[in-house]
């Protein structure tokens, strides 16, 4: 598949186009231009390194939304074996913006749950662009409870603009569904490892991300609102999205510094979409490391750690306060 370049990547796109043109010429020419192709390839790689070393939060947000970025099912194919998808919330419907099911991770049985956006127009409409309705979150809750019953670790993959804000979703109890998930995750007797792989949009992301370990891919985002939404509220125009992205502190490094996530998983040069298999291999290693730390941990200790972790959010200490 031909790589789609973002606006700030246009200098890279121009170099890659020249390289592709030279490769096409070399196929039909007796002249050896392989050295020139290698020189340009090296230049392109260095340019990519330079651009990606100085990304703004708004540019990171664009990478997190890249149309070729790997989604949950891409990672399921690369990381897990024997995946068996489970459907429906047993209450209303089967929301396809949430996928989940039983699988094996390094031979160990587990439960996998994640958002799924869709690749083309038809699939995006079918999956509601990765924005779950209440039945999606209730499906996730059902699968978590099933995993809890059989003592299976849970892996969740977060990639959503947010919970669907439509009237029908509100009528069926969107906020209740999200809140109930938070309650269930807090009391699980099995470890839950959450990974933000793309967009982590507000409560729609949090509804499957109350983890014992929360990690983010290097160019993923996690925030209470989208930059455009924030800009529209504060500045009355979405054109201020770059400033809003800066103010929201939505990048992995900013959130790690604040203690809101535990780990950052590095991405291949140019983002996860440039090397899906390489990205999956790095993520698999990180998931294995995270899961190992719960070996031999009792249910009581697991829940106590989680309780302390949740209570630590939002704590602060005043220094230098005047008497």
From Swiss-Prot:
GO molecular function: acetyl-CoA carboxylase activity; ATP binding; carboxyl- or carbamoyltransferase activity
Enzyme class: transferase
Keyword Kinase among record annotations: no
Domain CoA carboxyltransferase C-terminal intervals: 39-293
Record protein name field: Acetyl-coenzyme A carboxylase carboxyl transferase subunit alpha
Family: Belongs to the AccA family.
Role noted for this protein: Component of the acetyl coenzyme A carboxylase (ACC) complex. First, biotin carboxylase catalyzes the carboxylation of biotin on its carrier protein (BCCP) and then the CO(2) group is transferred by the carboxyltransferase to acetyl-CoA to form malonyl-CoA.
Keyword Aminoacyl-tRNA synthetase: no
A Gene Ontology term for the protein's cellular component: acetyl-CoA carboxylase complex
Pathway recorded for this protein: Lipid metabolism; malonyl-CoA biosynthesis; malonyl-CoA from acetyl-CoA: step 1/1
Assembly information from the UniProt record: Acetyl-CoA carboxylase is a heterohexamer composed of biotin carboxyl carrier protein (AccB), biotin carboxylase (AccC) and two subunits each of ACCase subunit alpha (AccA) and ACCase subunit beta (AccD).
The enzyme's E.C. designation: 2.1.3.15
PANTHER family: ACETYL-COENZYME A CARBOXYLASE CARBOXYL TRANSFERASE SUBUNIT ALPHA, ACETYL-COENZYME A CARBOXYLASE CARBOXYL TRANSFERASE SUBUNIT ALPHA, CHLOROPLASTIC
Source superkingdom: Bacteria
Organism: Cupriavidus pinatubonensis (strain JMP 134 / LMG 1197) (Cupriavidus necator (strain JMP 134))
NCBIfam families xrefs: accA, AccA_sub, PRK05724.1
Compartment(s) where it occurs, according to its Swiss-Prot or TrEMBL record: Cytoplasm
Chief location category: cytoplasm
One BP annotation, GO: malonyl-CoA biosynthetic process
Reaction equation(s) it catalyzes: N(6)-carboxybiotinyl-L-lysyl-[protein] + acetyl-CoA = N(6)-biotinyl-L-lysyl-[protein] + malonyl-CoA
Matching InterPro entries: Acetyl_CoA_COase_a_su, ClpP/crotonase-like_dom_sf, COA_CT_C
Record's keyword terms, sorted: ATP-binding, Cytoplasm, Fatty acid biosynthesis, Fatty acid metabolism, Lipid biosynthesis, Lipid metabolism, Nucleotide-binding, Transferase
């Amino acid at each position: 598949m031909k790589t789609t370049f973002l606006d700030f990547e246009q200098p890279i796109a121009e170099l890659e186009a020249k390289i592709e043109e030279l490769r096409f010429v070399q196929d039909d020419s007796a002249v050896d231009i392989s050295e020139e192709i290698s020189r340009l390839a090296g230049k392109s790689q260095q340019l990519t390194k330079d651009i990606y070393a100085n990304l703004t939060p708004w540019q990171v947000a664009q990478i997190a939304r890249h149309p070729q970025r790997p989604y949950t099912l891409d990672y399921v194919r690369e990381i897990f074996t024997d995946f068996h998808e489970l459907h429906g919330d047993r209450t209303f419907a089967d929301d396809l913006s949430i996928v989940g099911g039983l699988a094996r991770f390094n031979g160990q049985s587990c439960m996998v749950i994640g958002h799924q956006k869709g690749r083309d127009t038809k699939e995006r409409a079918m999956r509601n662009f990765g924005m779950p309705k209440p039945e999606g979150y209730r499906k996730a809750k059902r699968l978590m409870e099933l995993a809890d019953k059989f003592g299976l670790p849970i892996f969740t993959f977060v990639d959503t603009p947010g919970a669907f804000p439509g009237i029908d979703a509100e009528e069926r109890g969107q906020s209740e569904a999200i809140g109930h998930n938070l309650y269930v995750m807090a009391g699980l007797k099995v470890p839950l490892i959450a990974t933000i792989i793309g967009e982590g949009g507000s409560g729609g992301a949090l509804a499957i991300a109350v983890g014992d370990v929360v990690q983010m891919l290097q160019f993923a985002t996690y925030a209470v609102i989208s930059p455009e939404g924030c800009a529209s509220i504060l500045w009355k125009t979405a054109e201020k999205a770059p400033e809003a992205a800066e103010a929201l502190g939505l990048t992995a490094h900013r959130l790690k510094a604040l203690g809101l996530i535990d780990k950052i998983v590095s991405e291949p040069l140019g983002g996860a979409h440039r090397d899906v298999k390489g990205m999956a291999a790095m993520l698999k290693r990180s998931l294995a490391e995270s899961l190992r730390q719960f070996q031999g941990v009792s249910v009581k200790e697991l829940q106590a750690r989680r309780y302390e972790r949740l209570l630590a959010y939002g704590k602060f200490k005043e220094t230098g306060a005047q008497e």
